Amino acid sequence: MFTGIIEQLGTVKDLEREGGNLHLTVEAEMSPELKIDQSVAHNGVCLTIVAIDGKQYTVTVIQETLDKTNIGELQIGNVVNLERCMKMGARLDGHIVQGHVDKTAICTEVKTEDGSWVFRFEYDKNSPSEVTVEKGSITVNGISLTVVKSKDNGFSVCIIPYTYENTS
């Protein structure tokens, strides 16, 4: 389980296909603290560490995850939002995030409003209209956010300057 509070940013260093799997190598300051078999959220997607080498580590992404997330669109040099699993007894500053993606959406509009940013997202028109609710929690690229507006096949969230400057 995760909180949706991004711990740090990582940089994609290598992408290697093997059958239907993708081996994703990330460089991050947290790498030396990680252990093989540990789960880390990458843009909100729960992935398991399979190798560690200094400041870099590798995870394996299966085809179903590639089909349902934006992980397959990553390129070398891209920045990813990272979060380690929550610790029992620690404060829950975001909301409970499982790291299992329900669907992807496309950002259709970004505008500034009163010193923050409003992002509008749209998803598949065949989706149920109850995917989001106003003032409900949602995770976008691993970031815990509150839905500002919820409409058929879309929603809006507001991003404060700190989040805008410290996440991808």
Where are these regions (language model features)?
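Conserved loop->alpha-helix
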Residues: M1-S168
